[in-house]
Amino acid sequence: MLLALAQWLQNDYSFLRVVNYLTFRAVMANVTALVIGLAFGPWVIRKLTELKVGQAVRTIGPQTHLVKSGTPTMGGVLVLVSIAVSTLLWCDWGNRFIWVVMLVTFGYGAIGWVDDYRKVVYRDPRGMSSREKFFWQTLIGLVAAVYLAFSVSESSNVRVWELFLNWVEGGLSLDMPYKSNLIVPFFKEISYPLGVAGFIVLTYLVIVGSSNAVNLTDGLDGLVIMPVVLVGGGLGVFAYVMGNAVYSKYLLFPHIPGAGELLIFCSALGGAGLAFLWFNAHPAQVFMGDVGALALGGALGTVAVIVRQEIVLFVMGGIFVVETLSVMAQVTWFKITKRRYGEGRRLFRMAPLHHHFELGGWKETQVTVRFWIITMLLVLIGLSTLKLR
């Protein structure tokens, strides 16, 4: 919005030309989201407390968590509002990619909101059934995947009301390398052709998988939000490079017109995430809830598939991957041993993995900070693939 206003007024006020620079708008999006989050955080926490939207804590988990019972949840609303306002203020409204990411983010946020609402207001610990939640995740993920597969290839910029016009004719052939190939990190000449069906399936799996992986990781004070910020920042760098014709050519990446605008979204996510961490750091004043975790995970997955860095997301988000695998392994092993021995056995003290370390003697803050450190290293490894190819 501010970009269009600045372009309209820049002939009379030349200093407004600075708004045309993507990096300037990215910085401002970060600051704007940070300020909104810090300014409205106390009010949101107070309102959630008044509404008695408190988190129920499982008694079978670490006993140190029992003191958290009643802490306001659904704080992810603060993150999403901060991202939305900041992104819409500083992005180019005609960019297709921005709207796709926003659709997935807030669509998954709506799923999480309903799930949280049922848990804390209706006092239903199950929330949405797994089948119901998966159905809506699948629907939104497939809509995004199909749109990205068949949307116009040549340019990402259109008028807002033209976002869904002539979309099939522009994308059926999938003639752009960034759409049809899976890019393999560290190898500049190796990529795997996907085709239409392959692209849609991969996009769907990455979006839904990323959303659920981030949600599973959200179990300790401050644990998930910092990795989300770090991975989002890393993907923002890829978006900037892939969207810049000069940098993408120099680094031997396919040029994706308009992808650089996703840096605005990633920067807003970073600012909103840091603001939320201010209140979510141990001891947490508010929890994110599914409304935030599902949405942010979906956002990371969507950005990754747009910039064709699905494997890099797997690397940078290694903590999310390991946490998810720990749950899958725990459930699978329990079922196998129950059939074989008549009694289920566990691979870990408790899943997801962060609870395993807690029950092993690590303090909550130790688990959190150590997972942050691991994520920092993984993000650096992911960023190294820009040059080490």
Swiss-Prot record:
InterPro entries: Glycosyl_transferase_4, PNAcMuramoyl-5peptid_Trfase, PNAcMuramoyl-5peptid_Trfase_CS. Its EC number is 2.7.8.13. It comes from the Bacteria. It is found in: Cell inner membrane. Keywords: Cell cycle, Cell division, Cell inner membrane, Cell membrane, Cell shape, Cell wall biogenesis/degradation, Magnesium, Membrane, Metal-binding, Peptidoglycan synthesis, Transferase, Transmembrane, Transmembrane helix. PROSITE patterns: MRAY_1, MRAY_2. It holds the Pfam family MraY_sig1. One of its GO terms (cellular component) is plasma membrane. Signal peptide: none annotated. Its cofactor is Mg(2+). Its main location: membrane. It is a multi-pass membrane protein. One of its GO terms (molecular function) is UDP-N-acetylmuramoyl-L-alanyl-D-glutamyl-meso-2,6-diaminopimelyl-D-alanyl-D-alanine:undecaprenyl-phosphate transferase activity. GO terms for biological process: cell division; cell wall organization; peptidoglycan biosynthetic process; regulation of cell shape. It is an enzyme of class 2 (transferase). It catalyses: UDP-N-acetyl-alpha-D-muramoyl-L-alanyl-gamma-D-glutamyl-meso-2,6-diaminopimeloyl-D-alanyl-D-alanine + di-trans,octa-cis-undecaprenyl phosphate = di-trans,octa-cis-undecaprenyl diphospho-N-acetyl-alpha-D-muramoyl-L-alanyl-D-glutamyl-meso-2,6-diaminopimeloyl-D-alanyl-D-alanine + UMP. The chain crosses the membrane at residues 25-45, 74-94, 97-117, 134-154, 190-210, 222-242, 259-279, 286-306, 311-331, 366-386. Pathway: Cell wall biogenesis; peptidoglycan biosynthesis. Catalyzes the initial step of the lipid cycle reactions in the biosynthesis of the cell wall peptidoglycan: transfers peptidoglycan precursor phospho-MurNAc-pentapeptide from UDP-MurNAc-pentapeptide onto the lipid carrier undecaprenyl phosphate, yielding undecaprenyl-pyrophosphoryl-MurNAc-pentapeptide, known as lipid I. Belongs to the glycosyltransferase 4 family. MraY subfamily. This is Phospho-N-acetylmuramoyl-pentapeptide-transferase. It comes from Cupriavidus taiwanensis (strain DSM 17343 / BCRC 17206 / CCUG 44338 / CIP 107171 / LMG 19424 / R1). The lineage of its organism: Bacteria, Pseudomonadati, Pseudomonadota, Betaproteobacteria, Burkholderiales.
